[in-house]
Design a protein with these regions (language model features):
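Short flexible coil/turn linkers enriched for glycine and charged/polar residues
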Residues: 10-13, 144
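Mid-domain, small-residue-enriched loop/turn segments at the edges of structured enzyme/sensor domains
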Residues: 20-80
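Domain-terminus/edge residues, biased toward the C-terminal soluble/receptor-binding domains
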Residues: 43-44, 61-176
Length: 176
């Protein structure tokens, strides 16, 4: 549970690797599982190599997705997954604190998803960044009984970190 919060709120990539190795034995096998599941939920143009989304190449293929597939993954996570309620709880938390096994040291995670406070009805989202992809974001909002999802890829590079927030707001307002 602590690893999931640290991964989703703080984007601690090492947590994704630990989870992948625990679930599947290796990150390679976990990536295969992710690719199989992505296809199962309708993603047509996604190929995962790393469990944390970092840039990678395997043979002639690169770790990649599309905005459409990323939105599809978010839709699954918040609407169709048997764990949707847990996903929404985790990604909607402003902060989370846990301790080491001895209880001596506390660790604090803070949610970097500024969109949660930007618009009424914002329910979930996840930030991302790599050198190849730039700043990325997928977020969801519910208003008037409808769910809206925005997925942004390559939305600025360093010195333009906040573009994703203004672009998300513009697209959400357009959809409303």
């Amino acid at each position: 549970k602590d690893l999931i919060y640290a991964m989703m709120l703080e984007s601690f990539n090492d947590c994704a690797v630990v989870i992948a190795e625990q679930v599947a034995g290796t990150t390679e096998h976990f990536s295969k599982m992710m690719n199989d599941y992505a296809k199962k939920i309708g993603c047509a143009d996604t190929f995962f190599i790393t469990p944390n989304g970092l840039d990678a190449q395997k043979d002639s293929q690169f770790h990649h997705t599309t905005a459409e597939d990323l939105a599809q993954i978010m839709r699954y996570c918040i609407k169709e997954s048997p764990k949707a309620d847990q996903f929404l709880k985790i990604t909607g938390e402003a902060e989370y604190t846990f301790t080491d096994v001895s209880g001596k040291y506390a660790y604090h995670c803070y949610n970097h998803n500024a969109f949660l406070k930007m618009m009424d009805g914002a329910i979930s989202g996840k930030t991302g960044f790599t050198g190849n992809a730039g700043y990325c974001y997928v977020g969801a909002l519910e208003q008037n009984g409808k769910t809206y999802i925005v997925a942004l890829l390559a939305c600025g590079w360093p010195n333009n970190k906040t573009y994703k927030w203004s672009d998300t707001r513009k697209l959400m307002e357009y959809g409303l």
